[in-house]
Design a protein with these regions (language model features):
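Intrinsically disordered, low-complexity regions enriched in Ser/Pro/Gly/Gln/His and often acidic
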Residues: 5-7, 27, 107
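N-terminal Lys/Arg-rich, disordered targeting/topogenic segments
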Residues: 1-13
Length: 222
């Protein structure tokens, strides 16, 4: 049997010399191509979803007890409350806790939803013209049929108080069907946006899949 000749070192050297510029060119074109690709709306949307899915996934352990207390009172899954909190204000890290549309507090309530749409100033998007002292008055909220809750019994139902805000969100979501398992309907009632529903449900399902680990982390931090 004849011994097969391998590729000589000289030939290999020439192959490397020839292929190296081609490899570098392909690499540069790939970078340029991606830079152009990310300008396409569909790709931008995909990138946003990936970023939102990987950024700040962890539920702050100190909040879990509040979510669970609200769940006990209203029958709304605490993981759903956490998902809303994550989407609305990134677990209260948004500054200020006031949107350009007028939504207020940790869970971004429009004043008319918090105080009640039967308030004489309410209409449109729900910003209303409600005096500040009336916005946090349990008596006024009861009078106008709002969803604000004085969860800590300090005499105020304050959307800027975290416990009050979480309980108020649970109250609203329960009334919208979440306590009866109509999760998607309740989320849509909270914000009439399909994208909003998609985002909240994404984190809700994520937290549901991690619920044992999240609860264990909350317990160990106490």
């Amino acid at each position: 049997m004849k011994k097969q000749k391998g590729i000589s070192y000289k030939t290999k050297g020439w192959m490397i010399v020839l292929l190296l510029p081609i490899t570098i060119t392909i690499y540069i074109l790939a970078i340029i191509g991606w830079q152009q690709l990310v300008k396409i709306p569909v790709v931008q949307e995909w990138a946003e979803i990936i970023n939102s899915s990987t950024a700040k996934l962890d539920v702050p352990t100190e909040y879990i007890e509040l979510y669970k207390k609200a769940e006990d009172n209203y029958g709304v899954p605490w993981t759903l409350l956490a998902a809303h909190h994550r989407i609305e204000t990134r677990f209260s890290t948004m500054d200020p806790l006031l949107s350009p549309a007028g939504a207020e507090g940790h869970l971004q309530f429009m004043p008319c939803t918090f105080v009640g749409w039967s308030h004489p100033s309410c209409g449109g998007l729900g910003k209303g013209d409600i005096p500040e002292k009336d916005k946090i008055s349990p008596a006024i909220i009861e009078q106008y049929g709002g969803y604000g809750v004085d969860a800590n019994n300090d005499g105020k139902a304050d959307p800027y108080d975290l416990e009050d805000a979480i309980f108020s969100a649970a109250n609203y979501l329960a009334a919208s069907g979440a306590a009866d398992g109509e999760i998607e309907k309740a989320v849509f009632n909270y914000n009439h946006s399909e994208k909003y529903v998609e985002d909240v449900l994404h984190f809700y399902h994520l937290y549901e899949s991690q619920v044992k680990n999240l609860q264990a982390a909350a317990y160990s931090s106490q």
